[in-house]
From Swiss-Prot:
Belongs to the mer family. It holds the Pfam family Bac_luciferase. It is an enzyme of class 1 (oxidoreductase). Its EC number is 1.5.98.2. GO terms for biological process: methanogenesis, from carbon dioxide; one-carbon metabolic process. Its main location: cytoplasm. It catalyses: 5-methyl-5,6,7,8-tetrahydromethanopterin + oxidized coenzyme F420-(gamma-L-Glu)(n) + H(+) = 5,10-methylenetetrahydromethanopterin + reduced coenzyme F420-(gamma-L-Glu)(n). Pathway: One-carbon metabolism; methanogenesis from CO(2); methyl-coenzyme M from 5,10-methylene-5,6,7,8-tetrahydromethanopterin: step 1/2. GO terms for cellular component: cytoplasm. This is 5,10-methylenetetrahydromethanopterin reductase.
Length: 328
């Protein structure tokens, strides 16, 4: 099992670099930095991380091909690979409609866009001149002036078609899920895609990009996770809620509380233990270890400790290192 950790660059880059270095010291394999227009720039942050770490792999988790042209993404991640001494990985997905609506960007044909973007980026970083007349991505003889070599590309994927595509073309897949029930479904779709492409499914790094909250006090861990879990519930398809026995109407209730900024309601009971169980890896080190082993048994090969990580971030990173990574 590999371990990754997610940081949101809402904090200054040097603070993120401190946490990344600490994560490296605790045995984490990957640091993933989110890419969103309202935070610090992902590639500027990754540059600071590259200069302040030695061995941990680093990359965006995840970027997209709507706000960033694939040629620009290729140039950016190739630069990170060069600065870091070959430690770059690229997480790329379809993005989310709400963000694109806020930015005035049309979200068209995410499956075709993601597939064509990955092909173009691979060609760019291998030094090829790219001529592409795709359904969504088009180039007319564009070429980078330097070659990066091999950079693993992970697809952010949720739905069945995206998961199948990841099995066909990606080195890894980043799945926003925490529960074995969701991975039973996801792993089968990834296998289907891999077999379609004539690949061994074991070539694909199946990653649980999870809401993670760890503390020796389970109540503190749960309370730290509630707001993140609320956003997950509010954005989950009805099918996923039903899979976990969560009433579909809870989505609108939680969505309304989020819209009003009523976080007291979320903390006070709207976010139920059932939701915490379904949408997070949460609790004491023993609780988290049990869930990780259950996910490993299904076929998950990397756990990403996503927001909030724990009620106290530095303490949580050390706890994961000492009580989970060291014992795996």
């Amino acid at each position: 099992m590999k371990f990754g950790i997610e940081f949101v660059p809402s904090d200054p880059a040097l603070k993120i670099a401190y946490y990344a270095k600490l994560s490296e010291q605790q045995g984490f394999d990957h640091v993933w930095i989110t890419d969103h227009y309202n935070n610090r720039d992902v590639y500027s942050t990754l540059t600071v991380l590259a200069l302040n770490t030695n061995s941990i792999k680093i990359g965006p988790g995840v970027t997209n091909s709507y706000t960033r042209n694939p040629a620009i993404t290729a140039s950016s991640i190739a630069s990170i690979a060069e600065i870091s001494g070959g430690r770059a990985v690229l997480g790329l997905g379809p993005g989310d409609k709400a963000t694109f609506d806020a930015m005035g960007i049309a979200w068209k044909k995410p499956l075709a866009t993601t597939k064509e973007a990955i092909q173009a980026i691979r060609d760019f970083i291998s030094g090829k001149k790219v001529s592409m007349d795709g359904e969504m991505i088009k180039f007319a003889g564009a070429k980078l002036a330097f070659k990066a070599g091999n950079i693993p590309i992970y697809m952010g994927a949720q739905g069945p078609k995206m998961l199948e595509l990841a099995g066909e073309i990606a080195d890894g897949v980043l799945i926003n899920a925490s529960h074995p029930k969701d991975f039973e479904v996801a792993v089968e779709q990834i296998k289907k895609g891999a077999e379609k492409a004539g690949r061994d499914p074991s070539e694909v790094d199946v990653t649980a990009y999870a809401c993670f909250s760890i503390d020796k006090d389970p109540v503190k861990a749960v309370n730290a996770a509630k707001v993140v879990v609320a956003f997950i519930v509010a954005g989950s398809p009805d099918l996923v809620l039903e899979r976990h026995g969560i009433p579909v109407e809870a989505k609108s209730q939680i969505g309304a509380a989020i819209a009003k900024g009523d976080f007291g309601a979320l903390m006070g009971g709207l976010v139920t233990p059932q939701m915490i169980e379904a949408f997070s890896i949460c609790g004491t080190p023993d609780d988290c270890m049990k869930r990780i082993k259950d996910l490993e048994a299904i076929g998950v090969t990397q756990i990403v400790a996503g927001s909030p990580i724990g009620p106290a971030k530095e303490k949580a990173i050390k706890l994961i290192g000492k009580e989970i990574i060291a014992k795996m």
